[in-house]
Amino acid sequence: MKLEVNLKQNPYDIIIEKGALKGVGQWVKSLWEPQKIALITDNHVGGLYAEKVKLSLEHEGFEVVVFNFLEGEASKNLKTVNKAYEFLIKNGMTRSDGIVALGGGVVGDLAGFVASTYMRGIHFVQVPTSLTAQVDSSIGGKTGVNTPSAKNIVGTFAQPDGVLIDPNVLETLGKRELIEGMGEVVKYGLIDDPELWQLLDNIDGSVHSILENSETIIYRSCNVKRKIVVEDEFEGGVRMYLNFGHTIGHAVEQTAGYGKVMHGEAVAIGMVQISRVAEKKNLMPQGITRQIAEMCVKFGLPVDYEPWRVEELYTALTHDKKARGNSIKTVIVPEIGKAAINQIPLVEMKEYLEK
């Protein structure tokens, strides 16, 4: 399966194919001339796949160096970025060389940020290994790292030269790591794809069902994001729809402590909680919050978080990139398969969170 991201300046393809990881070297060679490659990964994914990917790349004539960092959201910061810069400098990486991001969303976000800023930008590709990364973060060119005060507050827009997705690697994920990716999948069904929502409604929510339908789930999710990114690369309009559930979700991730609530879990919480607010304001139809919550629960996703620290959540919301003065742009779902943007006063948001 192939999806074309037909951007005017940086078009690229998304390849979705079971077993594709075996041919990663040939795929990269179809994009780049043989050169030096920095393979950026974390200690967990690296232990599973780094050597195989390195050998595949070397077989095609690439010189490969591997940068490993400690897995998890807590590593997605400027300290790790600086270590990566020093590694690239030490290994003589130039602007004609490239980066291969091998891992989940943390690896992809960090490696993309490093690639887009090292020497003012070098080429990179994404090889996502988690469901969250395969359906969401590897596509669209958003890169970024966290600070103690806010998630993804430091970042760039930088498109990869390609994305290679092998659904087979999902079989090595733990149950929680697989299920959290369904938070983003549910989001795609809600904002733009009622057929995807229907598929999710029809399957039983088990790990087996997710893996059995993984190619279709990944393809439909990627296609939603592809369409939106092509229409609005730099988030001037409809790309905001992709943030459904993320406003409160990011606040939950931050206040809980990075890594304690996984990203897809936080998105699920955020979707349910913002829908609850929107229902109370009559911006969404009555009963839709219950539908969203039931879908999330079916896949084992959380819909609430304890302890619910309103003051800390409110402070996090004020630091959100979507905050404008005394209000914040939020995404709502007036009906399944359709999204809209609404401006909610921050004080009002706080009042709803307290109830």
From Swiss-Prot:
One of its GO terms (cellular component) is cytoplasm. Keywords: Amino-acid biosynthesis, Aromatic amino acid biosynthesis, Cobalt, Cytoplasm, Lyase, Metal-binding, NAD, Nucleotide-binding, Zinc. Its EC number is 4.2.3.4. Binds 1 divalent metal cation per subunit. Can use either Co(2+) or Zn(2+). It comes from the Bacteria. The keyword Amino-acid biosynthesis applies. Pfam families: DHQ_synthase, DHQS_C. Its cofactor is Co(2+); Zn(2+); NAD(+). It is an enzyme of class 4 (lyase). Zn(2+) binds at residues 184, 246, 263. NAD(+) binds at residues 71-76, 105-109, 129-130, 142, 151. GO terms for biological process: amino acid biosynthetic process; aromatic amino acid family biosynthetic process; chorismate biosynthetic process. Pathway: Metabolic intermediate biosynthesis; chorismate biosynthesis; chorismate from D-erythrose 4-phosphate and phosphoenolpyruvate: step 2/7. One of its GO terms (molecular function) is metal ion binding. Catalyzes the conversion of 3-deoxy-D-arabino-heptulosonate 7-phosphate (DAHP) to dehydroquinate (DHQ). Belongs to the sugar phosphate cyclases superfamily. Dehydroquinate synthase family. This is 3-dehydroquinate synthase.
